[in-house]
Design a protein with these regions (language model features):
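Conserved Class I S-adenosyl-L-methionine
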Residues: 219-279
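A short acidic, Gly/Pro-enriched loop at the edge of an enzyme's catalytic core
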Residues: 123-136
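Short alpha-helix
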Residues: 198-213
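Short, glycine-/aromatic-enriched active-site segment of Class I SAM-dependent methyltransferases
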Residues: 171-197
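A short glycine-rich, Lys/Arg-flanked "PGG" loop and its adjoining helix->strand segment in the class I
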Residues: 149-164
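N-terminal auxiliary segments of SAM/dcSAM-dependent transferases
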Residues: 1-18
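Class I SAM-dependent methyltransferase SAM/SAH-binding core
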Residues: 63-65, 74-122
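Conserved alpha-helix/loop element of class I SAM-dependent methyltransferases that forms part
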Residues: 29-33, 39-60
Length: 279
């Protein structure tokens, strides 16, 4: 038990510095309209975060958990625009340390904290009592979990009645000529292998897991319906993935190449989810 989670933690020992160097504090896809309008990856990411905060109904004084908070960009922005208290968690202390530093730089250490949890603590989130939080958020982090359903059950438990689960995540899907599992996995298996992902879910699969956890799904949306999901990372490598000269550059070059291939095939996408705990 825990081998996959340990692998993910070890991956981010190396990937964390690379991601921060290449992407800054914001590591997820942005709002599609903002990307199309030519906004920077960071501004597009903030635009999506602001929409997710609104969907969560977070207000000043509320309490939220941001799961898989990385180096803190999304967590800090959500706290800043909502006035809510946020706790960001990951299983990698280097990430947590960088996130704490970023929160201090942005002047929000009084409302945003970051904690490192155990490799398998996502299965229960036992540090949080039943019905204690107004929202649970995540950005492209649940994809790394082998037992995604356990996380959704834990999130549902710690939400207050009326509290909301909101997030975005990497997904796989049939697209164009790639319709069978075998055809899809031709492109997705290398992504899994190079980016330390046990398996990608589907839009319907995530909806089912969230509903099985006892939440009512209000939104389950493919953010790139009918189009290839390039986001802010087009194949011309504007962020410099192939020029990265830090530790293990070949790891990130291979990951970038595999992900670009899956994007080009159309079988990779990003989904948005909003769910509420019944009162």
């Amino acid at each position: 038990m825990g081998d996959v989670e340990q692998q993910v933690r070890a991956y981010y020992d190396v990937a964390g510095p690379a991601y921060e160097a290449l992407m800054g504090p914001f590591w997820h896809h942005g709002e599609l309209a903002s990307e199309a309008a030519g906004l920077s990856p960071a501004e597009s990411a903030k635009a999506l975060e602001s929409k997710m905060v609104a969907a969560a109904g977070l207000q000043s004084g509320g309490w939220a958990l941001d799961f898989g908070s990385g180096v803190g960009g999304a967590t800090v922005h959500m706290a800043s625009v909502s006035g809510a208290h946020f706790v960001g968690v990951s299983n990698n202390e280097w990430l947590s340390q960088r996130a704490r530093g970023y929160a201090a730089e942005q002047g929000v250490s009084d409302t945003v904290t970051f904690h490192t949890i155990g490799d398998e603590d996502y299965r229960t989130l036992a540090a949080w009592p039943d019905g204690s939080l107004d929202a649970v958020t995540w950005y492209e982090s649940v994809v790394h979990l082998p037992d995604k359903a356990a996380f959704f059950r834990a999130a549902a438990r710690i939400l207050k009645p009326g509290g909301r689960l909101v997030g975005v995540d990497w997904l796989q899907r049939p697209f164009g000529e790639h319709q069978t599992d075998e055809q899809i996995m031709r492109w997705m298996e290398p992504v899994n292998r190079h980016i330390s992902i046990p398996w990608h879910g589907t839009l319907d699969g995530y909806r089912a897991m969230i509903e099985d956890a006892g939440l009512v799904v209000e939104v389950a949306e493919d953010l790139y319906t009918g189009v290839q999901c390039w986001g802010s990372t087009p194949p011309e490598d504007g962020q410099g993935w192939y020029e990265y000269d830090g530790e293990a550059p070949e790891v990130f070059a291979e990951g970038k190449r595999a992900l670009d291939d899956a994007r080009a095939a159309g079988v990779f996408t990003v989904g948005k989810f909003v769910a509420v705990k019944p009162a």
